[in-house]
Amino acid sequence: MSHQILLLLAMLTLGLAISQRREQVPCRTVNKEALCHGLGLLQVPSVLSLDIQALYLSGNQLQSILVSPLGFYTALRHLDLSDNQISFLQAGVFQALPYLEHLNLAHNRLATGMALNSGGLGRLPLLVSLDLSGNSLHGNLVERLLGETPRLRTLSLAENSLTRLARHTFWGMPAVEQLDLHSNVLMDIEDGAFEALPHLTHLNLSRNSLTCISDFSLQQLQVLDLSCNSIEAFQTAPEPQAQFQLAWLDLRENKLLHFPDLAVFPRLIYLNVSNNLIQLPAGLPRGSEDLHAPSEGWSASPLSNPSRNASTHPLSQLLNLDLSYNEIELVPASFLEHLTSLRFLNLSRNCLRSFEARQVDSLPCLVLLDLSHNVLEALELGTKVLGSLQTLLLQDNALQELPPYTFASLASLQRLNLQGNQVSPCGGPAEPGPPGCVDFSGIPTLHVLNMAGNSMGMLRAGSFLHTPLTELDLSTNPGLDVATGALVGLEASLEVLELQGNGLTVLRVDLPCFLRLKRLNLAENQLSHLPAWTRAVSLEVLDLRNNSFSLLPGNAMGGLETSLRRLYLQGNPLSCCGNGWLAAQLHQGRVDVDATQDLICRFGSQEELSLSLVRPEDCEKGGLKNVNLILLLSFTLVSAIVLTTLATICFLRRQKLSQQYKA
């Protein structure tokens, strides 16, 4: 009897499908995938090919999911129903899809309608991934909705209204590896809530309301995101033989007062504790009785045994450590000595007044060190330290007088940012410079140097000799005197030169010799002329804004025609006539000149015009008018002289005749 009923249903289904083939199918089918997203559909289409394996219905207006017509597509493996208005799931609707592996129900209304009264999702034996994010699920609604899914590996319950996780919340899904719970309001996680997930490796609990992590015992976990909570303490209470696999831990934007307990995580390679309230103590606790004393600044500190072998130290494998945006005033040497594998260290935006790395082979693998936005007054680096350091960020501190070879001792340094300090460079061997200056010559690895805003008064000759810089920023040093030969040695390497806002009236730099220079910024100075580029160079961008240029003669700019792509000229008293080279660039479009409609030039002594509107004949007419005026003035002057001479002669003759008559 049952076979006859199934046969009848199959015949009815086939007949219905055939009869509806004449209707226009709104979806596009490619390789057994039906693409129906964003079509404004009110129900699941019933006229699709019966052998489709993927059905994408996101971004429609579906409210109910019924066995018919969804049950027609028994070969479905991937079903996307996200971003609809679904509030009703007919009982057994997904059981009609025996091969279903991926189900996306994100951003619907499963918590507001009858979806939960139908028995939830039911048993889905082959389901691998399930997305229920953004459905306002709360309380025990999740438990009622979730069914038995023995093969489920990825589950998302993000962006819901969960406040608590119970021990039995995740029963029936023992294979889950990735669990996303971000953006809920979780305040409590019952002990053993994750015991039903023995294979869990990735757990996202970010953007919740958790205040404390205690008795952490998820040994198999590899990635844990606890960012954007209100966590004040992170502690573990592992079993004696526990072997934790945690490699990635994110605790940023919490309320941690102390460095977290990491003693049980020997495989940790990434740690982010930025945006907390962390302070590091001046030294390590001395007695074993103080090893777990938060009042000393250590929270079950992993650093409390300095005699431990570095290779077995819990932080010895750490590659990335972010401590930015905290309240750290001092980094003790004992904190750094075991970070033997660390490659990236961010200590920016703290309260550091000094930083020391004196111990030989300290931080041997560090590639990037960010100490920017502190109040650093002292930087002491010993010899043979930071041997792999390539990038050092020191901008916006209070550095003033440093040992002269502070940076020359860094064997691999490539990028150095000193913007916003008070550092003065020494000169070359012939001009060593004043006390407290820093030597930037003879650093063969350094390529990028930023010394903007350092209140430098003098840049001496040979300041960067034998240092192959490609980028040099000397901007915002008002009153800077660039001595002749200050940039000598950079002619073959320099590609970017920034000299903006220095008040320069004369530029004693032979720019045409810098054959690889691609970007030159001379804005906001008082320059009125440039050296002549008579041969082809590589300059692509030239910024001359807010200077005193009136003319850019072709004999000086001709060498730039093959390379120059962009020219900035606003804020200069340009002359409308005599700028034939510039006018040619505007009209021919060979160079992109900024704001050509607003680029104003002076025509004569008073009249101002848009440079793009000036034509050569305008200047010729202006020239003829000037010639005519000069001729008229000359004729008038000559006439006046002749008349004056004649009048004088007549007067003298009359006077002579008068004297003769009297005689």
Swiss-Prot record:
The keyword Acyltransferase does not apply. It is found in: Cell membrane; Cell surface. Keywords: Cell membrane, Disulfide bond, Glycoprotein, Growth factor binding, Leucine-rich repeat, Membrane, Repeat, Signal, Transmembrane, Transmembrane helix. Present in medial edge epithelial cells at 14.5 dpc (at protein level). Residues 291-311 are annotated as: Disordered. Residues 18-628 are extracellular. This is Transforming growth factor beta activator LRRC32. It comes from Mus musculus. The gene is Lrrc32.
